Amino acid sequence: MAKILVAEDDDTLRDLVVRALNEDGHELTVATDGVAALDALNRQNSEFDLLLTDVKMPVMDGIALALAAGRDHPDVAIMLMTGFADQRERAHGLDALVHDVIAKPFSLEQIKGAVREALVPRH
């Protein structure tokens, strides 16, 4: 399956996402903020297939992370998670960079389906 980096500062939601994606057999790395996620991306030399990140996080938010990841690791698909309508609008300004923006709350099946779709190669 895929190598996925999950950046989420909320412990409960992060655990839910990890559980859902583990069920699908993905190899996961977790980070609690954007700086830690960017460090993981740089350390792994872009071996990740997908960056799944929350938009609103401390230290570095998901938008800044997506911009840095897209610039430095263009082969990594990017998917954003947010519970805030204004953040969804802001994220949709990144359409060329971000594969999808998923609205919180979401079910296990919704996140699994969105990840499966994000992992389909874009042309």
Where are these regions (language model features)?
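Two-component/phosphorelay signaling modules centered on CheY-like receiver
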Residues: 10-29, 118
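C-terminal output helix
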Residues: 18, 106-118
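Acidic, metal-coordinating helix/loop segments flanking the phosphotransfer/catalytic sites
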Residues: 30-50, 71, 89
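Acidic catalytic/metal-coordinating carboxylates
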Residues: 33-36, 61-65
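Active-site T/S-Asp motif of two-component receiver
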Residues: 53-54
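Receiver (REC) domain active-site loop signature in two-component systems and cognate sites
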Residues: 57
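Alpha4 helix (beta4-alpha4-beta5 surface) of REC/receiver domains from two-component response regulators
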Residues: 64, 84-102, 109, 113
